Design a protein with these regions (language model features):
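Conserved N-terminal beta1-alpha1 strand-loop-helix module at the mouth
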Residues: 1-126, 130-198
Length: 198
């Protein structure tokens, strides 16, 4: 099972991940969000991260030219879409960049899961909403037809129980491994350990 730690904001966060060894490191690259980082900070984080930990750039309804600043310079190895991007946008994105694409879906009903199942993205992420720290109704996941990353409301304390009931392809956490708005090394290590042991 893959583990993504999202919302890195400092090179210190990358140093924590270098010892905790998750599978992916995520950065919010669209401006205007609490965890958004500049291109310069993103480059510094990428340079600090161990080469074998891919960096995921999270974008919200961004023009292709903006994504190119990160995709064409090696700052990111994966593109994650967290807005209202449609199938046409996704096809154009995949033609423009040769990076794998993760598409996030806010799950409030079975209809949202139906849309997610049809996505042409390389991976899909099922979430309660960007960075809310709250879970959606996991009972909706029964019989979901494709592999998915699970996000929203995950923490070191609850992840084992969640994974005892559901077997996602991977898990994605941000606020659940923070203390006072910053990444907490102990929580990150505890989360990774709990997932690896589940």
């Amino acid at each position: 099972m893959i583990i993504k730690i999202c919302g890195l904001m400092r090179t210190q966060d990358a140093e924590i991940l270098n010892t905790a060894c998750p599978d992916f490191a995520g950065m919010i690259l669209s401006p205007g969000f609490r965890r958004s980082v500049s291109a310069e900070t993103a480059q510094a984080i990428r340079s600090t991260l161990r080469p074998e930990i891919p960096a995921v750039g999270v974008f919200v309804n961004s023009p292709y030219q903006f994504i190119a600043e990160f995709a064409d310079t090696g700052i990111i190895q994966y593109i994650q879409l967290h807005g209202s991007e449609d199938a046409f946008y996704l096809r154009g994105l995949k033609l423009s960049f040769k990076l794998p694409v993760i598409q996030a879906f806010r799950i409030r009903s079975a209809d949202d899961l139906g849309r997610a199942a049809k996505s042409e993205a390389d991976m899909i992420l099922l979430d309660s909403g960007a960075g809310t720290g709250k879970a959606f109704d996991h009972s909706l996941l029964g019989g979901f037809p494709r592999p998915y990353l699970l996000a929203g409301g995950l923490s070191p304390e609850n992840i084992r129980g969640i994974l005892a009931e559901h077997r996602p392809y991977g898990v994605d956490v941000s606020s659940g491994v923070e203390t006072d708005g910053e990444k907490d090394p102990d929580k990150i290590r505890a989360f990774v350990s709990a997932v690896r042991g589940a």
